[in-house]
Design a protein with these regions (language model features):
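Anion (oxyanion) recognition and catalysis
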Residues: 1, 79, 120-121
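Hydrophobic targeting/anchoring helices
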Residues: 1-73, 160-165, 169-182, 197-201, ...
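Short hydrophobic alpha-helical runs that function as membrane-insertion/retention elements
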Residues: 6-8, 86-87, 127-128
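Extracellular/periplasmic catalytic domains that process cell-envelope and extracellular macromolecules
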Residues: 37-41, 94, 121, 215-216
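A short, well-structured beta->alpha microelement
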Residues: 74-94
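Loop/turn elements at helix/coil->beta-strand transitions in domains of secreted/extracellular proteins
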Residues: 81-85, 96-98, 122-126, 219
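Active-site and adjacent substrate-binding regions of carbohydrate-active enzymes
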Residues: 92-106
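A conserved amphipathic helix/loop scaffold
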Residues: 104-302
């Protein structure tokens, strides 16, 4: 309410609108609606552990490091692909997930590495990143080499790592494109040169691999050993992970989120621009419009 105690404030109007829309949704709710097969094929998990947060935030190594932001980057990439994304703890079951991402999962032990290995052998697609597998549970760096425990997973070694100053830029080549980096670089050498997907192309780092992949059993492991500001390299590598696994993806721009729940597709627009939804002919819009306005919501069934 506003100060007169009668007139609805904007929040009150929004609340009233939501209540009316919920009534409309209840009228067409189908408790037997089946989970879309294309979403099941994209199901993605990101692994989180608060011990990693504390370990990474204490010695950040660079002023450009932010553990939460780094984790969020990979979540945003997955969501932009239209992938249903869950945050899991390391003890959770990974069986139902086609892709599992472990962003900067610094603290590991042999049991966790073996769990990842089993997941991949059974057909899972594991994505590891910089600062993964560097320390044991007590925060001690492994003597077997930088991130030594993950070497069997990635079939490669990491000889060193480095960061640039915030105003300096390095180059990485990947699939005939050149990308900028400056936050973090792992210098990787794969045991199989054909598994090296991206390479540093200038300065001291030139020639070393930045991204490698490895097939184990029915699945794959991809190690992204570089951190960029614009996320373009990580996004393109992640898209290849899904594509090689035969998983179709969307390409939603920043601020556009599309999810399915209880038989309803829901799209929201947190950007400043209109977004034209590409809906199937069978779609029936229940709330909103095909053109998704800023701060808008569209709900449909198909």
């Amino acid at each position: 309410m506003k100060s007169d105690g009668v007139t609805l404030s904007q929040g009150g109007k929004d609340y009233q609108k939501v209540m009316n829309e919920m009534e409309d949704l209840r009228k067409v709710y189908d408790p037997k609606a089946k989970y879309p097969a294309k979403l099941a094929a994209r199901k993605t998990a990101l692994l989180w552990n608060y011990d990693n947060l504390w370990s990474l935030e204490f010695p950040k190594q660079t002023v450009q490091w932010d553990t939460r932001q780094f984790f969020q980057k990979y979540m945003e990439i997955a969501k932009s692909f239209g992938a249903p994304t869950d945050v899991l703890y390391e003890n959770d079951d990974l069986t139902d997930y086609k892709v599992v991402i472990a962003p900067a999962f610094e603290l590991v032990d042999s049991a966790l590495v073996q769990k990842w290995m089993n997941y991949v052998k059974q057909g899972g697609n594991l994505v590891l990143t910089i600062r993964t597998g560097v320390k044991n549970r007590w925060g001690h760096i492994f003597r077997s080499g930088w991130a030594g425990p993950v070497y069997p997973l990635i079939d490669a070694t990491i000889s060193d790592f480095d960061q640039l100053l915030p105003d300096m830029i390095g180059k990485v080549d990947y699939q005939s494109k050149t990308y900028n980096w400056n936050n973090w670089a792992d210098l990787i050498t794969s045991n199989k040169p054909e598994n090296e997907l991206a390479h540093y192309s200038d300065q001291f780092y030139a020639g070393k691999a930045a991204v490698v992949t490895n097939r184990i059993g029915k699945g794959t492991v991809t190690y992204i050993g570089v951190d960029t500001d614009d996320e373009l390299l990580e996004r393109d590598v992640m898209r290849k992970v899904y594509a090689q696994a035969g998983i179709s993806t969307e390409n939603y721009p920043e601020g556009i989120y599309v999810q399915w729940r209880d038989g309803f597709w829901v799209a929201v627009n947190y950007s400043s621009n209109d977004y034209e939804l590409s809906l199937p002919e069978s779609a029936k819009i229940i709330l909103g419009e095909n053109t998704l306005k800023p701060a808008g919501v569209t709900v449909w069934k198909d």
